[in-house]
Amino acid sequence: MNQIGFHNFRKFQSFPNLDLSPITIFVGENNAGKSTVVKAILSVLDFLGTEIGGGDDLLGLRFFFNKSFFTHVGTFQRALNNSAKEGVITFTASNGLYRIQIEMEGDKEDEQSISAQISEIVLTILPFNIDLDYKFKSGQDRLIATFHSTPSEYYKDLSAPYDTPAMRENYHKARVKYFKDMTKDIEVEMPISNGSLSQGRIIEVLLDHFYSKVEATVKSLNNKAIDLFSNVLIINGLSKDAEDFLRSKRALLLQKPFVELAKNDVARRASFGGFEYIYAHAVTQTVIYSAKDINDYFVRTIHDFANQRIEKETEVYKFIVRWMKIFRIGIDYEVSSFGGEAHIVKIKNSDDRIVNLADKGMGSIQLMILLFRLASMMANAGIQSPGQRRGDYTIIVEEPEQNLHPKLQSKLADLFLEMYELYGFKFIIESHSEYLIRRTQILIAEKGFKSDEELKDFAPFKVIYFPGDDKEHYDMLYRTDGKFSNEFGPGFFDEAANLAFKIF
């Protein structure tokens, strides 16, 4: 995900589209809205990752607020902004390949309703700037496909998921030819129609539905055949412009690279990638970690990691040991399992002494849990070597600086940067750590960006400040020298200086 926006959700009546960087850090006052943005992201990712199809009906799609354990929303009424005039919530998100807007309606007076009816979804295929506007309201249900004649402002070539140089070249040629031939926007209206759906995530299903409509329509036009009894063929009602467009673009719409490449990476990208929420959690100095305590995030992380059975000399193992040394936790580790029902974690210190993880400080325990969770995600993504960017994962971390010495807080920035640059994982961080923020400034300065444009396109970090008092959030905006163009609100960076001034 590289963009999120919403209306009438939780704290915000309107939250304008926010562009996310590979590592986006939310800072600011308490109750300023950081958690609302995180809940919005989690809610959207959960919806996009849900499998539909089979017996499901496109016209009956619903958005559930009680499926994600992490969002803690539960009902539509709790999700809806208190000042909303109508029971309508809208989310907008993008991942560089697709942009999706989801509108839902619910009963604002119903305290028990756990879902809302999807009233409209606008899915944009960004490389070709095609809007698929699915209107689901009863009596108004239809698909309006708009083929734009100019590229989308939201699409950047550098953000597209190319697997090979050849694929990139084919994709580029197809786009150039497509827009060169387009002289004006073309709108094609089609009935949605009930019926069986392909199995998959929502974006996959909508794309399959769209392509099947286009294929049937183009073939019917080509054969000059109209099947009035089919709920797929939609020749009647087409404008002359739409007919001419579909006829002239037959080769492109039905053959490679449009269909195959536009659908390429759908399996990985349709849900906007995998995600993990590492929320602020307690740690305990317990020697044995029982799998029966699986509802405890701390214990579940150890249990999940143990089940990965990470072997020595693998990239994941090297990652853990490398960062254990950087964080001064130890120089090696061992996880022992008892019938898969309980685990013990041992740490090897720099003096070769073996101790239980429970005998380390709370900060070291906290960091090992973070490393184990990141390592599990690396293993799930099939990471086998540095530079193998299997990303498409968004990791949301809440207050990772808990229990950490300031020096170690700053090193978290290096950890997140390595996870992105070497392995492709993206992060959204909720933090109050001045030391973490200061370290990102140094890392930006060390990149040596030559211009503001280069900085904007390639800076790995972004810091968003939430000032509270219902004031609008803003981007702190790094400069090429690492300094910020904007100022933090009072009580963040200046609090230590203010207290020192009072002492003197």
Predicted regions and their residues:
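P-loop NTPase switch/coupling surface
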Residues: M1-S271, A381, P386-R389, R438, ...
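Generic alpha-helical secondary structure signal
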Residues: I102, S138, L158-S159, A166, ...
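Switch/communication elements of ASCE P-loop NTPase nucleotide-binding domains
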Residues: M1-N81, E86-T92, E313-F504
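The feature marks a conserved, polyanion-engaging helical scaffold used by nucleic-acid processing enzymes
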Residues: I234-A342, M377
